């Protein structure tokens, strides 16, 4: 298919790096990529603190190791997904098959919607566990990391919801058949059937018409005629 489809130009067209970097979808992916680092980075570095009763490390979120693991997994998954989808956006212009483009947009739409929901769950979960955390020297030391993870979890909800909306717009846009249809219609309308050649050597536009059928009646008497003497 030569026409544009799913918000991209014709297959094989050159990619403009400046326009690609200024696209809202690209900016949202970069923002989501940065937010994911700001979530799992502080949890990995400062999310586990020593308890007052022993040297073992516990999660800063109310000692719930599941909260720390969930935050790290969510942020790391978003980090890898943003990198993969950025690469897909770069290669999207080179995909010539409309079916493959549709699958790529559906994958983007489904993953963005799923991660928007997971970020909402993660934000609520981390906030709830942090509110239940008992104050102490350890929690005071890692408090900034916990609050940063919660804040950027909220920002990630907004960025991934925006990515979902952009993917939905691309899916609804679908295949743009207007260029292809216009070219075909204009070509068909302007092309005429050739006429028959005339004596001057120039093709005429008049159509050949057969002469009307005329029947000549024979009025002479039929049969044997007696000669006159």
Swiss-Prot record:
The modification N-acetylmethionine is found at residue 1. The lineage of its organism: Eukaryota, Metazoa, Chordata, Craniata, Vertebrata. Residues 209-229 are annotated as: Disordered. May play a role in regulated exocytosis. May indirectly regulate the activity of the plasma membrane dopamine transporter SLC6A3 and thereby regulate dopamine transport back from the synaptic cleft into the presynaptic terminal. Interacts (via N-terminus) with SLC6A3 (via N-terminus). May interact with VMAT2. Belongs to the synaptogyrin family. It comes from Homo sapiens. The gene is SYNGR3. This is Synaptogyrin-3. Its main location: membrane. It is a multi-pass membrane protein.
């Amino acid at each position: 298919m030569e026409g544009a489809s799913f918000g991209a130009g014709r297959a094989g067209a050159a990619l403009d790096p400046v326009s690609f970097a200024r696209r809202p979808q690209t900016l949202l992916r970069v923002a989501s990529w940065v937010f994911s680092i700001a979530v799992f980075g502080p949890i990995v570095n400062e999310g586990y603190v020593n308890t007052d009763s022993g040297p073992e490390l516990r999660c800063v979120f109310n000692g719930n190791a599941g909260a720390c693991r969930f935050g790290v997994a969510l942020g790391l998954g978003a980090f890898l997904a943003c990198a993969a989808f950025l690469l897909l956006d770069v290669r999207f212009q080179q995909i010539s098959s409309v079916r493959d483009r549709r699958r790529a947009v559906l994958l983007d739409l489904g993953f963005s919607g799923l991660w928007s929901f997971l970020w909402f769950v993660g934000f609520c979960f981390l906030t709830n566990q942090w509110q239940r955390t008992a104050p102490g020297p350890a929690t005071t030391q890692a408090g900034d990391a916990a609050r940063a993870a919660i804040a950027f979890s909220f920002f990630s909800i907004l960025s991934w919801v925006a990515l979902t909306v952009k993917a939905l717009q691309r899916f609804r846009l679908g295949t743009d058949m207007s260029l292809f249809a216009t070219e075909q219609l204009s070509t068909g309308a302007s092309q005429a059937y050739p006429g028959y050649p005339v004596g001057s050597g120039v093709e005429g536009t008049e159509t050949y018409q057969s002469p009307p059928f005329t029947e000549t009646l024979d009025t002479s008497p039929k049969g044997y005629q007696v000669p006159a003497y």
